[in-house]
C-alpha cells in the first residue's frame, strides 16, 4: 500500500459553490472558450472570491464547463459569491449558468498532476444540488438553508423547492435562493 494511502485523512468542512455553464457541450469550441473566459473573469472579480483567496481560504477546481469553489470559513461565503457572479453575468445574456451550494466534509488530495485538489461529500452534494437547477438558478442544500435561516438578512430569500432525485437515485432536499 502506498505511503500516501496510509496517511490519516484530514477532514474539514467546505462551503462549496458549484457553477456550470448551461448548454456548454452544444456550443462551438470558440464560443465555449469565450463564455468560459467571461465566467472566469466574473468569478475573479467577485469580492467574496478575492477576499477568500487573499486569505488563503479558498480552493478552485475547474470542471471544464464551470468550476467548484470551496470556501473554508462560512456558508455565507459561497452565497455572497454566487450573488456577485449572478449580478456580473446580467450583462452577458448568452452566458447562462446554474449554481449549487452545499456545506459538507471535504479532504485535500493530490490530483493526477500531483497538485493540491479537494474531494469528498461536500463537493459531490454541491454538484448534485446544482444538477437540480435550471439556468439562472442558485439552489442551496437544505443543510445550508437551515444554517442561513437563523439570520434575518437571508431568510426572505430562501424558498423551499422540495426534493429532487439525483444520481444513484438519491433524494436531496433543495431550497431556491431568490432575490429580485
What are these regions (language model features)?
Residues 2-80, 84:
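Catalytic NTP-binding/metal-coordinating core of nucleotidyl cyclase/transferase enzymes
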Residues 44, 48, 68-179:
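Catalytic beta-strand-to-alpha-helix segment of the class III nucleotidyl cyclase homology domain
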Amino acid at each position: 500500500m502506498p505511503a500516501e494511502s496510509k496517511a490519516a485523512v484530514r477532514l474539514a468542512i467546505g462551503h462549496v459553490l458549484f457553477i456550470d455553464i448551461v448548454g456548454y457541450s452544444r456550443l462551438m469550441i470558440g464560443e465555449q472558450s469565450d463564455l468560459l473566459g467571461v465566467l472566469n473573469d466574473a468569478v475573479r472579480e467577485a469580492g467574496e472570491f478575492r477576499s477568500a483567496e487573499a486569505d488563503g481560504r479558498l480552493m478552485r477546481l475547474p470542471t471544464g464547463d464551470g468550476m467548484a469553489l470551496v470556501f473554508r470559513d462560512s456558508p455565507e461565503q459561497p452565497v455572497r459569491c454566487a450573488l456577485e457572479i449572478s449580478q456580473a453575468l446580467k450583462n452577458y445574456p448568452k452566458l447562462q449558468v446554474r449554481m449549487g451550494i452545499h456545506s459538507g466534509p471535504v479532504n485535500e488530495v493530490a490530483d493526477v498532476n500531483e497538485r493540491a485538489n479537494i474531494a469528498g461529500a461536500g463537493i459531490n452534494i454541491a454538484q448534485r444540488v446544482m444538477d437540480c437547477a435550471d439556468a439562472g438558478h442558485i439552489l442551496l442544500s437544505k443543510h445550508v438553508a437551515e444554517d442561513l435561516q437563523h439570520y434575518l438578512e437571508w431568510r426572505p430569500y430562501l424558498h423551499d423547492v422540495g426534493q429532487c432525485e439525483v444520481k444513484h437515485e438519491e433524494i436531496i432536499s433543495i431550497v431556491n435562493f431568490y432575490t429580485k
